A protein has these predicted regions:
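Short, solvent-exposed loop/turn segments at secondary-structure junctions
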Residues: 28-31, 69-71, 111-113, 138-140, ...
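Acidic, metal-coordinating catalytic cores used for nucleic-acid/nucleotide bond scission
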Residues: 82-84, 106-118, 136-142
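RNase H-like polynucleotidyl transferase catalytic core
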Residues: 50-55, 124-144, 160-162
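C-terminal domain-tail junction helix/linker
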Residues: 167-211
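A general structural motif
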Residues: 18, 101-103
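Extended, low-complexity cationic-aromatic segments
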Residues: 1-92, 206
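Active-site proximal helix-loop segment of RNase H-like, two-metal nucleases, encompassing DDE(D)
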Residues: 131, 145-167, 178-180
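Hydrophobic "anchor" residues on beta-strands that sit immediately upstream
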Residues: 22, 105-106
Length: 211
């Protein structure tokens, strides 16, 4: 419920006006860097787009993204590994531009790199100014950054052809700026506290848990 409450407050701008920032963060690990053996043939009259099925692998990329909930702007960085050791410094870089904020609410899922002993100790060091909110188990869809990653991947990565890992990383960083210029906007989140409570109270057999 806390996460939904913050999303609803964004619509009234009340949280931002108090000098507080809400940021969602998520990772998309192990994105395959694939080089197609033949160029993709673009769509034309009477013919769908054709993509070569044979490819050469050039490793993987771990994409971490942050979503500034108030304005929908995207922050992106590619990590060498998808683990807590690389996640924690990335969080510092994500939060760095908001040194002016009285408080930052960071929404993340329950991934192992987010809940390890070292990462939890790291979050305690940042507390109380940095308030971490975990999505419920199997509730990562409540994290708006997950929706951002899906939309970003479909628009900028889905039909990619990469001759090296470095080229894909540079494309992601360049595309972040393009996304912020052309598409960034606050998400309209339909799943409200009221809808959640109605569902909770009218669905038999549910196991109650804190959200």
């Amino acid at each position: 419920l806390k996460i939904l409450w913050y999303y609803e407050r964004i619509e009234t701008r009340s949280v931002w006006q108090r000098g507080e920032v809400i940021i969602c963060a998520d990772e998309k690990p192990n994105i395959q860097v694939l080089e197609r053996m033949m160029p993709t043939q673009p769509m034309r009259s009477g013919q769908i787009e054709r993509q070569e099925f044979e490819y050469k692998r050039h490793g993987t990329v771990n994409l971490m993204t942050g979503l500034i909930v108030y304005n929908g702007r995207m922050w992106a960085e590619c990590l060498d590994k998808n683990d807590g050791e690389h996640f924690r410094p990335a969080v510092r870089r994500l939060l760095h531009p908001y040194g002016w904020a009285k408080r930052i609410h960071l929404i993340i899922d329950n991934g192992s790199s987010h809940t390890s002993d070292d990462t939890m100790a790291f979050f305690r060091e940042l507390s109380p100014r940095i308030h971490v909110l975990f999505t419920p188990v199997d509730g990562s869809w409540l994290n708006q950054a997950e929706s951002l990653l899906e939309a970003f991947g479909e628009r900028y990565l889905l039909r990619g052809n990469w001759m090296s890992r470095e080229l894909m990383i540079q494309h992601i960083l360049d595309s972040q700026s393009d996304y912020n210029q052309r598409f960034a906007h606050p998400f309209q989140w339909e799943w409200s506290c009221r809808k959640f409570l109605y569902w909770l109270n009218n669905t038999p057999g549910l196991i109650r848990c804190k959200t």
